[in-house]
Structures are given as C-alpha cells and as structure tokens.
C-alpha cells in the first residue's frame, strides 16, 4: 500500500471517527434547517394516512380523527425539527423507528406531545407528559407552552440514542439499550402493559409518524423538517 493510499485511509477513518463522536453528543441548540428536506410534501403525496383525516392548509398539518400519518420512507439515523401547537387537553406525539404501522404502539418509540396544563395530563405520570419518551422516560422539565402557542421541538435519533429538545431546552435523553424489560423502566417505574416490546430489542429504523386527534383534542404541526445523519 503506497503512502497516498495510507493517508487517504487514515483521513477517512479520522473523519468517520469525528462524525461518530459528534453524533453521540446531544445538540445544544435547535438547528438551522434551511437546506433540510420536508418531512411531508405539501400535497402529502409522500405520506400514508387514511383518506380525509389529515389536511395540510396554509402550512399547518392537522387531523380530524385519531389516526396517525406516516412517512412512506424508512429512516434510521435522523434529526426532525418541527413546530407544534396544542389545544386544551391535547395528547399526541411523534413516532420514530416504527416497523409495523398497523400495530405501531408496541413497535415504535413515541415522543410525547401533550397539554401539560390540562388536569388529566398534569396529574399523570411524568412519562405521559410533553417531551417524555412515552411510558418509559419522563422529561427533566416541562417546557411546553400554553394551548394556542407554537412550540419548537427537535428530535435526534442516532442508533439507540434519542435526544428531545423543546423550546431550547434538552428535556429527554435516552439510551434504548438500557430498557431491557417490557414491564419496568431502569428506575423501577412500571411500563404500560400495551408497550410490550423492550426498547433494547426494537430495530433502530422504520417509518416516522405523527399521532392524530387523540383523546378528543386536536394537534397542529408546521415547519416539519428532517435531515438524515
């Protein structure tokens, strides 16, 4: 192997090592998304959803029923940046690593979106509140704004690491490899029975989804961007 080839191999190795290190570090701020791709096309031609449920008007995506909308594309490592607005009592979420859209609840990771000001969610376990990894990891703080105000959320999924930032604050950091049980979280708290697959066993790729009008209250999304990493 000549010197030029050796230098090229070493250079590539250092570059890959640097990228790997950078991806393992939680983002410090919301990203600049100018060149990122849309999560969904304005005409929803790249989405999977029941007819008549989801509408995209004036840049705002919302649902009339409790039905999710999915990307047609399968993603593994990625960053999603979006804005969401709750109504009174909203309970929604961003769904990652979904390998079964018909039975997504035990076959995906849900990043919770909720109106934490509503009594039913304020009094629920922390793992049900906005910014949680639903049923598994409570956010370190509640950063969601009151209903009717827009929030910004950035979700980074890199292999088994998941980072959730809301309104400039990192609220959840998860290493899925630590969730080896389907019954209890690493801190000893109970996992809801319908979340029957240990996160350590979940594939780290799949469709991305948004939960619809769950629990009777609407949810609104806009400026939804994605970057593969």
Model features per residue range: what roles?
Residues 19-229:
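Carbohydrate-interacting regions of secretory-pathway proteins
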Residues 1-8:
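Bacterial N-terminal signal peptides that target proteins for export
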Residues 8-17:
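Bacterial N-terminal signal peptides
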